[in-house]
């Protein structure tokens, strides 16, 4: 009887051990098997205005009202009436909205940080923000900020403690976090805006891929293992791009989008998809997800009325009337001198939830939510994994 009891106890212990190991593996973000949610403790984002939650506003002055009116009730560093796709990503993962790394007031970095700034590009711009509108915070600068953030946050976290442990991430979060990238749009548009030909614009794409690869590998070298990489959207459907280069507005598709702009965006995306596949082979211990936001955005624009939206090329927060309700010299919240008085003329439309374009460059919150809903389940991703399972997207 004693021998039987011992055997039974041993069997139970073995079963419990196996169950414990299985549970531990299931809860590890680093597990590569098909399984449950990844439980990312933080998100670190790199990008441009499509995901900027306050970087440029912290540097050069806040995005003015009516930006932020729909969700935040006030300007919140976003060039939008409300939330961006990156905000919906954070919410979906059960995390707080990301604070901009450059914002020194009221920020909390416990669950990540945002290095994106509006106007940023992969390559450094050979001009200034005030001349071109493009940010000096290129992708390599964003990575330098990220390195500084790791080093300085952990120095303070470990040596000062106290309140700092409530606003800074744990050291292990840097290897467990999801790293998101949404950048490249400004490299294409800025090249066109200096009157380059399509052939000249296309010629920079290989260099963009090399630079992007280098930065992603640098993030990998600092512990990053889970990457969620957005492609660029249909640039030929952005009113500001069409006004900057009206010669490229024709030929247009049935929606009024520039065929030329969009073909270059599609070429960029093709090369980006190849780049992500190459990274996947180079680093088989990491998870790289390529996310096709182009398809989500073009679906919204080309089927706007069917999906409950108004004219997708008509700017909500703009000025000037005309085809796009956009004057390039007057942005959203912008002012003009009227009879010697400075008057706000860049006003919001009555119902932003019915519009796709917020300010001629960026989407409304409603449009961003549509895009997020299209990508969150993984139907537009390669590999086709959901956001919450992006730690499982390893491939050969």
UniProtKB/Swiss-Prot annotation:
GO terms for biological process: acetylcholine catabolic process; lipid catabolic process. It is found in: Secreted. It is an enzyme of class 3 (hydrolase). It holds the Pfam family Lipase_GDSL. The keyword Phosphoprotein does not apply. InterPro entries: Cyclin-like_sf, GDSL, SGNH_hydro_sf, SGNH_plant_lipase-like. Glycans are attached at residues 108, 126, 151, 196, 339. This is GDSL esterase/lipase ACHE. The active site is at residues 49, 359, 362.
């Amino acid at each position: 009887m004693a021998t039987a009891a011992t055997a039974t106890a041993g069997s139970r212990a073995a079963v419990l051990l196996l169950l414990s190991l299985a549970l531990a593996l299931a809860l590890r973000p680093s597990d590569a098997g098909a399984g449950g949610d990844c439980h990312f403790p933080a998100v670190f984002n790199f990008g441009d205005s499509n995901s900027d939650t306050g970087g440029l506003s912290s540097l050069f002055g806040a995005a003015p009202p009516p930006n932020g009116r729909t969700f935040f009730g006030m300007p919140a560093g976003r060039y939008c009436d409300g939330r961006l796709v990156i905000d919906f990503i954070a919410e979906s993962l059960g995390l707080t909205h990301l604070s901009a790394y450059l914002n020194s007031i009221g920020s909390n970095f416990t669950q990540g940080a945002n290095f994106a700034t509006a106007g940023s590009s992969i390559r450094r711009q050979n001009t200034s923000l005030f001349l071109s509108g493009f940010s000096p915070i290129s992708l390599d600068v964003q990575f330098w900020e990220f390195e500084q953030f790791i080093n300085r946050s952990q120095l303070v976290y470990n040596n000062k403690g106290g309140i700092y442990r409530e606003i800074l991430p744990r050291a292990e979060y840097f290897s467990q976090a999801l790293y998101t990238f949404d950048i490249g749009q400004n490299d294409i548009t800025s090249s066109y805006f200096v009157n380059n030909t399509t052939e000249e614009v296309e010629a920079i794409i290989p260099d963009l891929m090399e630079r992007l690869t280098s930065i992603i590998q640098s993030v990998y070298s600092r512990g990053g293992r889970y990457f969620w990489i957005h492609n660029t959207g249909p640039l030929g459907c952005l009113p500001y791009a069409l006004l900057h280069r009206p010669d490229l507005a024709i030929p247009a598709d049935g929606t009024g989008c520039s065929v030329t702009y969009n073909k270059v965006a599609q070429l960029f995306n093709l090369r980006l998809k190849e780049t992500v596949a190459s990274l996947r082979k180079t680093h088989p211990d990491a998870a790289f997800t390529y996310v096709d936001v182009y398809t989500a955005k073009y679906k919204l624009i080309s089927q706007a009325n069917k999906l409950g939206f108004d004219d997708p090329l008509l700017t909500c927060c703009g000025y000037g009337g005309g085809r796009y309700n956009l004057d390039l010299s007057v942005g959203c919240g912008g002012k003009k001198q009227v009879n010697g008085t400075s008057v706000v003329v860049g006003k919001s439309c009555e119902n932003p939830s019915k519009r796709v374009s917020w300010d001629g460059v960026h989407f409304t919150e409603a449009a961003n939510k549509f895009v997020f809903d299209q990508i969150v389940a993984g139907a537009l991703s390669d590999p086709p994994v959901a956001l919450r399972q992006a730690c499982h997207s390893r491939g050969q």
